[in-house]
Amino acid sequence: MSSDAVKKRKPKVIRSEAGTPETKRGRAESEQDVRVYNEEVELEGRDPQQDYTLYKETCAALAKLMSEIQELKTSGAKDGSAEIELRRKQSSIHFITLKKLNRLAHMRLKKGRDQTHEAKQRVDVLHLQLQNLLYEVMHLQKEIGKCLEFKSQHEEIELVSEDEFFQDAPAEISRPQVTREDHHQLTLARLDWELDQRKRLAEQYKTSLSSKEKIQKAIEQKREYLSSLQPGLHNIMQASLPVQEYLSMPFEHMQKQAEVARHLPPPLYVLFVQAGAYGQACDKNLTVSIRGDVDEAKALSRPPEDSQDDESDSDAEEEQQNTKRRRPTVGVQLDDKRKEMLRRHPLSLGIDLKCKDGSVLHLYFYYLMNLNILTVKTKVSTSVDLSGAISAGELLNSESLLNCLYASDHGNETPNPANRYQFDKVGITTFADYVSDLGHPYVWVQKLSGLQFSSDAAQSELSGSALSASHMEKSMKLLRGRLQSRLALHKQFSSLEHSIVPVSSECQHLFPAKVVSGLTRWTMMSHQEFTELSFVQHVLKAGLVSETDLFFKAVVERGTARLLAAVVVNPRYPEVTPLFSLSLLWKGERSGRTDDNLRAMESEVNVFRAELQGPRPGLQLLTNQIQRLCMCLDVYLETESQVSDGSEGPKEFPREKMCLRTARGPSRLKPFKYNHPQGFFSHR
């Protein structure tokens, strides 16, 4: 652009109306105030869509004018020519229009924001009002709940029903014409009737007490009369001894045994009577005998506690008399006190339980006089030699044979709470240290002898002979069942150690005719070895294992696959199902925690007890579990997808089992359920 053109444009840019600057500024401000006001009024009547259309048209016209000016300048027209000036004026008008549209847009935006802010304030006010109402409702509900929960003292009194009240109560108390309409008066009338009844029953109670005293006096008189018959009966029995010898009748033996039984302590006597009665009535293979020194038992004429106190007094007198005698050390005194506290009664009781196969369970019951508890020792006699199975060494161990005969009854601690304070005096930390010498103080042994302590007194109201009789039959059945189950396990372990899983003919239908996977190893392990296995940690955390359980390790193999099974056999087997935990060594190491199909195999073995129990009482449960484990391993390997390495040839595990579906669900579970007699596998 030339300097002449600049000089020509200057007067146009600074050109303005005449007047001083102050006058022009004041006039401009007044005109702008009017324009702003007019534009606000005008904004109410304008359509935003039309303004948007006008904006696009103005922009298009402005672009067209700019292009025309560009063409004119390109064609050689001068900057101040009439055509360029005309288009420049038109462009200025369009710029003014755009500015106006911009102002209107900003005004609309401000107006919209103001309206939004006002609406938001109204919403906030309504929300606060709603919250206040909700708080008031919650407060009223709490107050209503307090009112509804209020209980008057008369509500704790058990009243007769309204029908019985109107039927039995006299009219002066019931007043049906008033109480049937007024609930409050009805409640008062029922309370009056209850008071009247209780007064009448109190009088009847006094009358019953007086009659009870009369009956007790009559009973005492009859007892005295029956006691006077004892000498005569004894003479008759002595006179009949030659007849008993001639007829070979056991009355004399029974009489002698009864004479010895008189010197038994009360708990052993209760057990002797109840066990003998049960043997005569229900179990002919049960025999009871009394063992020990009768003369020493006769010498115990005073209670153990009194004799112990007298002995301590006599020892003190001897020490005072023999002052020159050397006093024993503290350790020796404690040992003597421990021996005295743990002293057994001279007489003990023996019970022999015979089984059909000729095996005998010998039970020896001892009474600890100062502790007031019974202990038991066991011994098993079998008709055949059972020394073949190495893993069955703990099955017939006398120390663990009767563990958990009842649930959680380990027999390592005394059930008498008072013994804890007695142990503290003589420095005994735990009774378990003396169990091997004295026997196990099982809770069921105490109940068989009629002993009941405060720890379990709340569970039973029986005591003495009634308590013993209530537990005798069940305990004897459990003892015989424990012996049978351990003998069956001993026989099964002998086969398992030779890699043979014995399956009886009654259980053959539970498995297919051909099971390729086989047991290759069966060994016993300790609790410490079990806890060190990585794939059983979830079982330990769940508390499903205790130190009294029996632990075994089974290895099942097929080809290159090797399945490890940690087996936990509860002492109450087969009542409690053995627990299997699995780990598969094949193409890496897998366990039930990482492989859903191994977890399903564990479920097949651990959960479905009813299918594997076999004939009652379920002594074949463990071997059936192992056989099912071998069957499930076959299904697992045969249905597992083979990863091709590019080589041709037969698969390692050809499919021999018929399956409806090889996998199901997102976890791709395999069909482990065997369906007999169809012979195919399906999902559960």
From Swiss-Prot:
Residues 1-32, 296-337 are annotated as: Disordered. InterPro entries: THO_Thoc5 (IPR019163). Residues 306-320 have a biased composition (Acidic residues). One of its GO terms (biological process) is mRNA processing. The keyword Transport applies. Component of the THO subcomplex of the TREX complex which is thought to couple mRNA transcription, processing and nuclear export, and which specifically associates with spliced mRNA and not with unspliced pre-mRNA. Plays a key structural role in the oligomerization of the THO-ddx39b complex. Belongs to the THOC5 family. This is THO complex subunit 5 homolog.
